Amino acid sequence: MPRVISIVSGKGGVGKTTLVGNLGAILSKKFDKKVLLIDANITTPHLGQYMGVDFCQTTLNDVLRGKALVDEALYEHESGARLIPASIELHDLKGIDISKLKKVVAEANKKIKDTEIVLIDSAPGLGREAVASLKASKEVLFITTPYAPIVIDVMKCARIAEHLKLKPLGVVVNMSHGKGHELNKQEIEALVGLPVISTIRHHKEVHHSLSARKPLVLHRPRTQGAKEFYRLAEALMGVEQTNPGVLARLREIFNRFYSTTPKNTKKMQAQ
């Protein structure tokens, strides 16, 4: 059975979609994992746009309404990751029953038999969309910025995940500037009750990748921000990080000599 991981935040704008896109690209392209990304933020979806897959004919909305099969809403990204986007059209919110998300995820795992990891880009907060993502998952990774109001919201999300008996993977602190007015690692861990497994600093290159509609690890793989996403992916996969300097040099060599020309994004059917 594949790992099903929801990426959860208590507030929008903390980098949840950016995290999902970059992790998906790394796990697929570098770890050779069969990865499925699902945009479960139905009301304000961004994952498809971030990955360069938008204005799709068939989306998760159609599947939730029972008007399409799950494999009909499946698209392949240039990284090799598969993606089920949500519709950006306002009228496509009609007739959506988000409580069916768990059933859709189960159906996707049944039809796409080689999937190893499912990453769900959940809606922020504690509403029905966010809870539906949690209920469809087995594991949960929390993301926050280093400020008390947002960390407190994550604390609430963590309590719901605990109630649902989900496996917590820890907390990612995003957009850190390393300033004294920010909460530090120990303070965040004390509030949430979970370990901080990664701190990703604020990098302007992330904004460039947003404009390019491409994950940072593909758009600018040698940047410090990309390296931080790599280290997080390694932690999630249980890779030892005893000598990150060597890993960084190996990646640089790989990127220099073995980088490939991106494929066009294409729609695919389940195999």
Specify the residue positions occupied by each region the protein language model found:
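Short coil/turn connectors at secondary-structure junctions
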Residues: 1-3, 31-33, 78-79, 113-115, ...
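Walker A/P-loop phosphate-binding motif and the immediately C-terminal alpha-helix
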Residues: 3-40
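Residue-level signature of catalytic and energy-coupling elements of molecular machines
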Residues: 12, 39, 63, 84, ...
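Short, conserved glycine- and acidic-residue-centered signature motifs
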Residues: 20, 97, 101, 150, ...
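Solvent-exposed alpha-helical segments within well-ordered globular domains of core cellular machineries
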Residues: 25, 45, 61-62, 72, ...
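Conserved catalytic-core segment of NTP-binding enzymes
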Residues: 36, 103, 107-111, 117-208, ...
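P-loop/Walker-type NTP enzyme "switch/lid" segment
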Residues: 37-111, 210-212
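C-terminal lobe/tail of nucleotide-utilizing enzymes
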Residues: 163-271
